[in-house]
Design a protein with these regions (language model features):
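Active-site-adjacent structural elements in enzyme catalytic cores
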Residues: 1-186
Length: 186
């Protein structure tokens, strides 16, 4: 059974910290950021599973870090670079897919919507996660947006990367996993 309580305030699962060793270690970033934790307890480590794709050599310790359970059904790619270069690349790729008849989506933010206006095929679903100056708005929309793309039958999603500062680290952690670690620098 799945219980849906509607929109949530934060949109991210909790931060998980392992305190069983001398130096506490963040196992999963969340709305309580690395910086907040460091300000309170001092030295804090970071599980290397957060920083890169799990391999046979190491596996994540935290629940929710082992699987792509929030991944959309679509092929999702994240593009990293300047806003203009990322938008140009996404516009080109999204239009190519849409012109071939594939349901296509774009994930952006309020500040970048103007980069896409009148340049994308009218059938492309463009979603802003929120305001870059208010990362909690982005965190709040993550999973709803991915599910909305699923409901629409989207086959390809092209998204922007975000700053990994403060809560942005948790946002990019979730998006990176959802994209199967498919991040392209432009």
């Amino acid at each position: 059974m799945i219980i849906d309580g509607g929109m949530v305030g934060m949109g991210l699962e909790s931060t998980i910290i392992d305190v069983t060793s001398k130096t506490p270690m963040i196992l999963r970033p969340g709305f309580i950021t690395y910086e907040m934790i460091k300000d309170v307890i001092g030295e804090v480590g970071v599980d290397k599973a957060i920083l890169s794709k799990p391999t046979a050599d190491f596996k994540p310790k935290a629940p929710g870090m082992k699987y792509r359970h929030y991944a959309p059904e679509a092929d999702y790619s994240i593009y990293r670079g300047t806003a203009e270069k990322v938008a140009d690349k996404i516009i080109m790729l999204a239009n190519e897919k849409a012109d071939k008849g594939f349901k296509t989506g774009v994930i952006t933010v309020d500040q970048h919507l103007n980069l896409y206006q009148r340049k994308l095929n009218k059938d492309i679903m463009v979603v802003s996660l929120g305001n870059l100056d208010k990362p909690e708005t982005i965190a709040n929309m993550l999973f709803k947006t991915l599910r909305d793309f699923d409901k629409a039958g989207t086959k390809f999603i092209f998204g922007e990367a975000f700053s990994q500062h403060n809560v942005g680290w948790a946002i990019m952690n979730r998006l990176t996993k959802a994209a199967g670690y498919n991040i392209i620098d432009v």
